[in-house]
């Protein structure tokens, strides 16, 4: 079991499965998290900016997760801008209310992954559909 920043205990791949379900079948009234772009291909050393837009004000209750192939999701950023322990300082989160960004200042080969935002402001907690980052 893994503890997320939103206080939910989940099996390793449950977070991604729930993200997909909420994205596809979100109930009326749920906060929708929309990520863009859906995918991008960058060269090592380039600056990357991922965006996440909430359908209503979530203050700064947004987290960012990284999921590498065949691995469980890892928390990168919580509270919109707080870097989780051990996360390299090239990862920076910003934003408030409805508009949020995750920036990778100098992308590295090991950053190949899917990146998801999630909101913990209003139950049920919801997640974006993700951005797939590929390295050229």
Curated annotation (Swiss-Prot):
Residues 30-52 are annotated as: Framework-1. This is Ig kappa chain V-V region MOPC 21. Residues 86-117 are annotated as: Framework-3. Residues 118-126 are annotated as: Complementarity-determining-3. The keyword Signal applies. The lineage of its organism: Eukaryota, Metazoa, Chordata, Craniata, Vertebrata. SMART domains: IG (SM00409), IGv (SM00406). Residues 127-136 are annotated as: Framework-4. CDD domains: IgV_L_kappa. Residues 53-63 are annotated as: Complementarity-determining-1. Residues 79-85 are annotated as: Complementarity-determining-2. Residues 1-29 form the signal peptide. It comes from the Eukaryota. One of its GO terms (biological process) is adaptive immune response. One of its GO terms (cellular component) is immunoglobulin complex. Residues 64-78 are annotated as: Framework-2. Keywords: Adaptive immunity, Immunity, Immunoglobulin, Signal.
